Amino acid sequence: MHVRDHNLAFKRRGLLLTLLVGGLALGMSAVGLSGCSQGVAAPSLQLPPLPYSQNALEPYISQKTVEFHYGKHHLAYVEKTNELIKGTNLAQLSLGEIIKQTAGSPDKAAIFNNAAQAWNHNFYWQSLKPGGGKPEGELLTKIQASFGSVENLKKQLQDAATTQFGSGWAWLVADGDKLKVVKTGNAENPMVQGLTPLLAIDVWEHAYYLDYQNRRADYVKALIDNLLNWEFAAANLPKA
């Protein structure tokens, strides 16, 4: 074969390979992350994109903290969950369903811990918003009915997040028609107690240590006063 013919054949093979790969990618895109068709492997859990840029929470949370917290810790929980559920029936489920099905099972503790931490972090990033805001409408009415005032709610959140011993979370939750502040240790999630999370504050040290060192109370106050996403909380209220 002449060199020219050889080059043409090589180019044809390259074109066919490109079309094949493109077709596979298109097919995978059509399946999506919400489900899988018969004979197609279950989609893996993904790290959701942040709802803002990595420096958007400054000066209260630095870009460096977000890079480590989101890009290292949060990602690791997602990847470990995928590793642990691969090839099991759990691989077909959402994070929320995985949490509910593994809660309280000692033999599935590793799956629960990683799945819950992945879910908790998804929720935490959405619980924050550059510039924060104020509770309004139905949420404000429920806060006043449950706590007396927004300031009383903020004080309870501050106390819960600051006094949580060791790693964990502070939450604003709905319990039926009433709102409550609860705290959970390690990876625990209020959903397994039948509560509806509205907002979350991460008090694991990786959430604040680069910026605040051991001053957890300062970190918590900065979030409550400047970054809490009250619109997100309102959207999470149980529907009547």
Regions found by a protein language model. Give the residues of each.
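C-terminal segment of N-terminal export signals and the immediately downstream linker at the start
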Residues: 31-57
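Alpha-helical scaffold segments that form or flank carboxylate-/histidine-based iron centers
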Residues: 59-73, 96-119, 186-189, 193-201
